[in-house]
C-alpha cells in the first residue's frame, strides 16, 4: 500500500474550502462585514490555482511508477484513464454553462488533455512548457483585445457557443483559459515527478 502524503491532503482540503468561499461570494455578492470581505479576498485566485496544481500532482503520482520504470504499457493505461476523466469533466462542465458561466471543469478537462501529451515527457520539458504558457500570455494580450466578447457590467460572454467565441474563451479570455492556467497543472505534474518523500527537496521548494 502506497504511503499517503499528508501535506497534499491538507492542501487539497484548504483549496476546496477556499473555492467554496470564493464561489459563495460570487453568488451572494460582496456586501457584508469588512472582516468577512478581507477573509474571502485572501482566497480569490489562489484556491483555484492551488487546486489545479494539486490535480497535476495527483496525475503525476498516479503514473509515477510506470514513468520511472519506463513501463509503456502502464503509461498507456494511465493515459486512457486520464482521457476518460478529462472528457467527463469537459462535458459535465459545458452542460451547466448557462447556469454557472464561471465553471472551471471544462477548462480542467482541456488541461488534462495537455497532461496526456506530456505524460511521458521529461520533467524539464514539462516545466518548460508551463513556462511557455505563462510567458506567451502577455504577448497574446498585445496581439488580441482581451475584452472581446465580454460585457463586464453583466459578466455575460457573447458568442460563447460559436466556434470563434468558444475557442477564444477557452484558450485566451475565459475565466480560467488554457493560456496561462494550464501551466498550474503542468507545474503540479513536474512537482509530482520529484521525490516528495525527500525532506531536502521539500525544504528547497
For every predicted segment, state its role.
Residues 1-205:
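Alpha-helical transmembrane segments and their immediate juxtamembrane cytosolic regions
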Amino acid at each position: 500500500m502506497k504511503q499517503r502524503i499528508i501535506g497534499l491532503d491538507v492542501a487539497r482540503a484548504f483549496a476546496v474550502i477556499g473555492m467554496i468561499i470564493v464561489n459563495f461570494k460570487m453568488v451572494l455578492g460582496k456586501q457584508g462585514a469588512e472582516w468577512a470581505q478581507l477573509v474571502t479576498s485572501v482566497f480569490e485566485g489562489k484556491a483555484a490555482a492551488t487546486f489545479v496544481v494539486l490535480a497535476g500532482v495527483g496525475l503525476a503520482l498516479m503514473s509515477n511508477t510506470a514513468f520511472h520504470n519506463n513501463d509503456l504499457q502502464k503509461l498507456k493505461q494511465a493515459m486512457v484513464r486520464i482521457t476518460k476523466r478529462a472528457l467527463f469533466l469537459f462535458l459535465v462542465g459545458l452542460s451547466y454553462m448557462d447556469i454557472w458561466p464561471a465553471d472551471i471543469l471544462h477548462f480542467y478537462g482541456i488541461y488534462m488533455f495537455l497532461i496526456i501529451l506530456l505524460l511521458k515527457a521529461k520533467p524539464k520539458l514539462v516545466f518548460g512548457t508551463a513556462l511557455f504558457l505563462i510567458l506567451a500570455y502577455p504577448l497574446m494580450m498585445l496581439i488580441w483585445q482581451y475584452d472581446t466578447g465580454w460585457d463586464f457590467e453583466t459578466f455575460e460572454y457573447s458568442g460563447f457557443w460559436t466556434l470563434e467565441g468558444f475557442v477564444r474563451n477557452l484558450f485566451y479570455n475565459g475565466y480560467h483559459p488554457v493560456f496561462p492556467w494550464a501551466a498550474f497543472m503542468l507545474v503540479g505534474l513536474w512537482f509530482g515527478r520529484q521525490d516528495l518523500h525527500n525532506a531536502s527537496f521539500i525544504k528547497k521548494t
